[in-house]
Regions:
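Small/polar-rich, solvent-exposed N-terminal microdomains that initiate assembly or binding
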Residues: 1-61
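Acidic-leaning, charged glycine-interspersed low-complexity segments
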Residues: 15-21, 37-38, 42-44, 90-139
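Alpha-helical context
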Residues: 47-49, 69, 76, 80, ...
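Short, cysteine-centered beta-strand-loop-beta hairpins and adjacent loop/turn segments enriched
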Residues: 52-54, 76-81, 141-147
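Phosphate-binding glycine-rich loops and adjacent basic patches that engage nucleotide phosphates
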Residues: 56-68, 97-98
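Residues at structural and domain junctions
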Residues: 57, 83-86, 122
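Oligomerization/assembly interface segments of phage tail-like spikes and tubes
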Residues: 62-78, 128-142
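Short histidine-centered catalytic/ligand-binding loop motif
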Residues: 79-93
């Protein structure tokens, strides 16, 4: 299986009641947020410590030309709230990314990654969203893979 598709599969396993095919994503031409369909109000996240509920949504994007994969989680947040709440939300998304890395390691996917970084993105124009994204350079990402 392609590295990017395997990473996406693991991210979706963490969100068993996630409605497949409706991730948040950035349109690279307009750099604006959009959604295909209505997303579930709450996701049930399975972690190694147990399960918990969250409103976070999986996100991914594959750039076939550069062989980079972005995967992570997005969530709506009110930026006029207490800054501590914003930090708590970012930490929640980071913990979900850490869980994803654990699962990637268990699936021997980490060996296929030769470059890695975290990005925290905020979007106040399109509904007050925060993303925590992991940016990978996947060595085995074929030139003809699909998003």
């Amino acid at each position: 299986m392609n590295t990017d598709k395997e990473i996406k599969r693991i991210a979706l396993e963490m969100c068993p009641n996630y409605c497949y095919g409706t991730p948040y994503y950035l349109n690279t031409r307009t750099d604006r947020m959009r959604r295909d369909r209505q997303l579930p109000a709450c996701l049930h996240i399975q972690t190694s410590e147990g399960s918990e509920s969250t409103t976070a949504t999986p996100y991914w994007q594959t750039d076939v030309r550069t062989r980079r994969v972005q995967v992570g989680f997005a969530d709506a947040i009110k930026f006029d709230d207490d800054p501590e709440k914003t930090l708590e939300k970012v930490e929640e998304l980071l913990s979900m990314c850490r869980e994803l890395i654990k699962r990637m390691n268990a699936s021997n996917l980490w060996a296929r990654i030769n470059e890695f970084s975290y990005n925290v993105l905020y979007n106040t124009q399109d509904g007050n969203l925060v993303w925590v994204l992991m940016d990978f350079n996947a060595t085995e990402l074929p030139r003809n893979c699909e998003d």
